[in-house]
Amino acid sequence: MDSAEPLTYDQYLATLPDERRESVARVWQVVRDHMPPGYVEEIGPKFLQFATGAEGYVALANQKNYVSLYLLPVYVDPSLKQKLDCVDKKLKVGKSCLNFNHHDDLPLDIIGEIVGTFTPQEFQEKLSRNRTSHRA
């Protein structure tokens, strides 16, 4: 397959190590089930993403030692981060993501809530306000 050709979801899953495939599929299914209408699903050779325009909303990427789930709504609304901070599980938090090896490492119910928070228009407006306030 030409590397410029877009992958299908099943093709993306097939590129993952066996031990990660089920967890990635379970986490991404939660994302899909809670995604508000209007976002576009994009599948690349290294990631899965829902975006609006040029802005990513939620993404999942297979890394060398773990899988990373990027939840951009958390960065435009601090109250959403507080939901993650209150979780009983010890989360592996990166600079802009949650890192995991198995889907059981994650609070999937809270992730679903976070994913479902903003319509594309609401997310774009929040993002724009945040960028404007950081420049001031």
List each language-model region with its residue ranges.
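Charge-dense, helix-prone N-terminal extensions
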Residues: M1-A136
